[in-house]
Amino acid sequence: MSAITWRPGQPKQEWGPRAWHWLHLMAINYPPDPSENDMARARVRIGRFIQSLPCADCRIHAAAYIAAVPPDASDAQSLQVWAWRFHNAVNRRLGKRQFPFAAYRQLYLSEMCWAEWSSACP
């Protein structure tokens, strides 16, 4: 999965869905039985992803979240649950709707969500 690049001054409404799309598809594509190297790489990728966010407040909030609730990269299901909880925590803080886990999996496993940067994904 390639890195995301942001345009300077790009509004959150544009880059936010792309960021979530990247994070969730990374979790969905994660191996069911990862090696120690896979686990370390996933945590590094998530850390770099957080550091790359174009919004300073978002980087601060995301870094605080992963410091309190580190990514669980022990297996695919755990990483998916972590990404889902992280997204719901951000939505809760922003006063947005929460997604049930079943709806999350159905959405991010659907073909229409697999198109790069699909508008079908939140």
Where are the model-predicted features located?
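Terminal, compositionally biased segments used for targeting/anchoring and flexible tails
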Residues: 1-122
